[in-house]
Amino acid sequence: MSVSRANFIKGTAATIVASSILFSGIGSATAAEVHQTLPGVSVAGVVPNAQSATSAFTDVAHDPFKAEIGWMKDKGLANGWAQPDGTAKFNPEWDVQRAAQVAFLYRLSGSPEVELPEHSPFIDVDESNPFYKEIIWAFQNDIVTGWQYDDGSRAFKPWQPVERNATAAWFYRLAGSPEFQAPVTPSFRDVHPSHPFYKEIEWMKANKITTGWPDGTFRPNAHTHRNAVAAFVYRYNVAVLGYGS
């Protein structure tokens, strides 16, 4: 069956404040507990705090985003995984998976009421999925469409890691899909104007939400890691919501 990659994700406007994904620690975060900060809770005046991260988590002392991770800890948005010795780990380089990312967006939107359908729109997501409600919400609000096959069925692939290009698209749409003229000359040598998420990635770059790698790449198909999510969330608050400066 062929898959329509261009139909991977769509977006919707949302008014949000920062939050983070807290996983329960099963495998590579295949089951997740997503904590929330509801709309109206100000994060103004909170700046990144590397000391908070290193004192809270034993595995981020040398992480380039330890300050942003500390900011999330200060806001009560990231508790990590408790260890038998009483310490905690953040697991900064773990992949963020699609189901968890959708749950993250749902909580950011205030955990709205969801009218569940009689049948799931996805062949691989049913009521046994811990994020069934969140995934249905995302589909109903045109945030995700999943992969559509030739026979008309759809798959969501909930435990597949989120790619960086999809993360860019989600943040762009969370900002309300603002008017933005992407540059003719690409900012990243591996993201060309023909890329389906070129505008969204360039918007992230223009708003300093992403910087890419020192070698001039964005690596759009690489998996999004937890430390990168911390950085993106913090920068989104500064650039789009005007908080955290």
Task: Please report, for each region that a protein language model flagged, where it lies by residue.
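Feature responds to low-complexity, polar/acidic, surface-exposed segments characteristic
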Residues: S2-K10, L22-P64, N79-V102, R107-E134, ...
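Phosphate/pyrophosphate-binding loop motifs in nucleotide- or prenyl diphosphate-using proteins
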Residues: G76, D142, K208
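Short, hydrophobic-biased amphipathic alpha-helical segments
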Residues: H225, V229-F232
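Short amphipathic alpha-helical surface patches that serve as generic macromolecular interface elements
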Residues: Y198-I201, R226
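A short amphipathic alpha-helical interaction element
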Residues: I69-M72, L105, A138, F171, ...
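Sec-dependent signal peptide hydrophobic core
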Residues: I9-V17
